[in-house]
């Protein structure tokens, strides 16, 4: 039996969503419950000028961060392709097999439905929008799990989880970039 526990692990300037799978041993096995956790996750903060990408351990430690330009030409047609190429390139460079990647979290400038769909046009991304970002990016990443959230919301969650708002009962965050969010 599989139990899935979703932990939101978003950071300011970097975001990641991790899922921990717990697998119960078959009857008669004395090992009890084992926790299986993959080693790596990627986070993307998609902005109108650049996309900031981070490679993390599933415990939340930042291993490496880098940026790629956001190509807003042709209504942002190549944004997801460029992000996938950056992640796949890093996996190849670091010899990280897909089986060790828990998934990818991406913060986008605009509202998001169901952790997957950007429902309106994002002006900061050249008119990009009205697409299932999670499904499209997952397809470009050979099936890696992708979850999507509003960039300001996930940045605030990151600050609550591991940043300046850790331990606070309430917090407010305003983000500045190509646009303003909060």
Model-derived regions: residue spans:
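Short, positively charged and aromatic/hydrophobic N-terminal segments
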Residues: 16-20, 25, 33
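Short glycine-rich, Thr/Ser-proximal phosphate-binding strand/loop in the N-terminal lobe
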Residues: 40-81, 85, 118-120
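Glycine-rich phosphate-binding loop of actin/hexokinase-like ATP-binding domains
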Residues: 166-182
